Amino acid sequence: LLIPGVSAWARPHPKALYTHSVAEGVFRVFYTTEGKHAVPADDVDGNAVPDRVDDILVQLKAADWFYQTQLGLVPPLKHSRYTQSDGIEVHVQHFDQGTGLAFDEPTKPNWFEGQSSTAPTLKIKIGSQVDPRLSTTPAHELFHVYQYAYSPFKTKWFTEGMARWLEEPFS
């Protein structure tokens, strides 16, 4: 079902965990402002997006730029492994332990009313408690997506060691 004049990522399914979304470039951030998974509602710039979500996007875009222009890495969506994918979904939710996760396999996109694409997406999860002004979790998890595009090798000493090393530019 297409709803004219509504962003493809504007309205969540009534049973969805996330009640809001914002998209910039290849990133689509899904979040809620209510309940256990809520991000703080502060919106200093008045753009109708919580500052926490804005800050996650800023860090993701900066990391994406850094990985491509300073390290010469090919963006994940340009790798043959992920050519069928059309974006990177970032799900902001509560974590009892840890601060983030990145997934290596493309999956069905988060369903939103008015969505026109059924192409698989890559997924990152960021803890709603993570403050990207103080934490490098978004950049760290995005680097894992870059790693997975290059190699299926997922041994922790390799993936975590490299990702932690690359947190330095964002610290």
Show which residues each predicted segment covers.
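Short helix/loop segments within enzyme catalytic domains
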Residues: 170-171
